[in-house]
C-alpha cells in the first residue's frame, strides 16, 4: 500500500504557484511538438510552430473555461475576472481538448486543408502528451480509482473516504501514453483513407 505525499504545487514563488498539472501540460506539448517536427513530413516547420502555439492557447483558454463553468461557476459569478487567474490552478482536460480541436479547425481553414487531413497527421503523436496529463491528474489526486486491497493501492491524502484505491491515473498514463502511442504508430505506417487514423485515436 502506498501513501504518497502529493502536493499539487511544484514550485512556490511568493504568490505565484507553479503546479504539477501545468508542468505536465507543458511537458505534453513539448513532447508532441518534438515528435511532429521530427517525424511528420507533411507539415513544414512554420506550420508545426503555429500548430503548437494555437493548440497551447486553445488548451489554456478551453481548459480554464471548462474548469470555471463545470467546477467553479460560483467563483466566476462572484468574480468574473477569476477566469484569467490561471496561476491559481484549475484546468479542465475536456475543456482543453475542445480548445485544441477548435484551434486545429481554425488552422485547417487558414491553411486550406481539410480538418481530418490535419487530424490524421497529428493524432499519432498525441498519446505521449495524454500520458503526461494523466500524471498531472495523479499529482492533483484527481480521477480517483475504485477502492481495492491490492498491494500497490494508493491512499490519497485528499480522499475524504481515506480508502486504498487503484492508481487509475497511472494505468491511464500507461495505456494512453504508451500502448495507444505504439498502436497509432502501427496503423499510421501506411497510407490510410481520410479520418482512418484520427478515427482510431478517438475510438
Show which residues each predicted segment covers.
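A feature for loop-to-transmembrane-helix boundaries and adjacent hydrophobic helices
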Residues: 1-203
Amino acid at each position: 500500500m502506498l501513501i504518497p505525499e502529493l502536493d499539487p504545487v511544484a514550485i512556490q514563488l511568493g504568490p505565484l504557484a507553479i503546479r504539477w498539472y501545468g508542468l505536465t501540460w507543458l511537458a505534453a506539448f513539448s513532447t508532441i511538438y518534438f515528435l511532429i517536427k521530427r517525424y511528420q513530413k507533411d507539415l513544414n516547420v512554420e506550420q508545426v510552430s503555429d500548430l503548437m502555439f494555437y493548440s497551447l492557447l486553445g488548451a489554456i483558454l478551453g481548459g480554464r473555461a471548462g474548469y470555471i463553468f463545470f467546477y467553479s461557476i460560483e467563483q466566476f459569478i462572484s468574480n468574473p475576472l477569476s477566469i484569467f487567474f490561471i496561476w491559481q490552478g484549475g484546468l479542465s482536460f475536456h475543456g482543453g481538448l475542445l480548445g485544441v480541436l477548435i484551434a486545429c479547425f481554425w488552422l485547417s481553414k487558414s491553411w486550406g486543408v481539410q480538418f481530418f487531413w490535419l487530424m490524421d497527421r497529428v493524432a499519432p503523436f498525441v498519446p505521449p502528451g495524454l500520458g503526461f496529463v494523466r500524471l498531472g491528474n495523479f499529482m492533483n489526486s484527481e480521477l480517483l480509482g475504485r477502492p481495492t486491497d491490492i498491494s500497490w493501492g494508493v491512499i490519497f491524502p485528499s480522499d475524504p473516504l481515506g480508502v486504498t484505491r487503484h492508481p487509475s491515473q497511472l494505468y491511464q498514463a500507461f495505456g494512453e501514453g504508451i500502448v495507444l502511442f505504439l498502436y497509432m504508430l502501427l496503423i499510421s505506417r501506411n497510407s490510410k483513407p481520410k479520418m482512418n487514423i484520427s478515427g482510431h485515436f478517438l475510438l
